[in-house]
UniProtKB/Swiss-Prot annotation:
Record-given protein name: Uncharacterized protein E146L
Protein induction: Expressed in the late phase of the viral replicative cycle.
The UniProt record lists the keyword Lipoprotein: no
Similarity-based family: Belongs to the asfivirus E146L family.
Naturally occurring in which organism (per UniProt): African swine fever virus (isolate Warthog/Namibia/Wart80/1980) (ASFV)
Membrane topology category: Single-pass membrane protein
Segments crossing the lipid bilayer: 7-27
One GO cellular component term: membrane
Subcellular location: Host membrane; Virion
Keywords, sorted A to Z: Host membrane, Late protein, Membrane, Transmembrane, Transmembrane helix, Virion
Length: 146
């Protein structure tokens, strides 16, 4: 009976160590920073032509100014991760995706929506939209392939 308990204990210790190593590997290695500014086409591409469905994002912040000069920030990590995961069931998943899809719109203050600030209810007319033309926008974060 003592031999079985020792075996179970040693297997448990090995599994805990492997889980700790996997946690450290995922959270502290392989993340590369990215930054896009207003006017850039935002494209995420895998380095080895693997499926974009395996790309993950962390600490992704979309920052923009409004026409009054106020600074706004949104955490868009979940949005980008869900965009990448959306390719998981594709028949021939691509190795890249562009924000805005086939339109390939450059990064601007409307790339992501903050309700009550840059949504359709707030920016109603063409004149309202024209005021946003010179507003700055940036997208920063970390990306990696899992």
């Amino acid at each position: 009976m003592g031999g079985t308990a020792d075996f179970v204990l040693s297997i448990t210790i090995v599994l805990v160590i492997l889980i700790i190593i996997a946690f450290i590997w995922y959270n502290f290695t392989g993340w590369s920073p990215f930054k896009y500014s207003k006017g850039n086409i935002v494209t995420f591409k895998t380095p080895d032509e693997s499926s974009i469905a395996y790309m993950r994002f962390r600490n992704c912040i979309f920052t923009f100014t409004d026409p009054k000069g106020s600074l706004h920030s949104i955490d868009v990590t979940e949005v980008l991760n869900n965009m990448a995961k959306g390719f998981r069931d594709a028949q021939n998943p691509p190795s890249s995706f562009t924000l805005g899809g086939h339109c390939q719109a450059p990064l601007n203050a409307f790339s992501f929506v903050l309700p009550g600030v840059n949504d359709r209810a707030t920016v109603v007319t063409a004149d309202d939209a024209k005021k946003w033309e010179n507003c700055d926008a940036t997208l920063t974060g970390l990306q990696r392939i899992i």
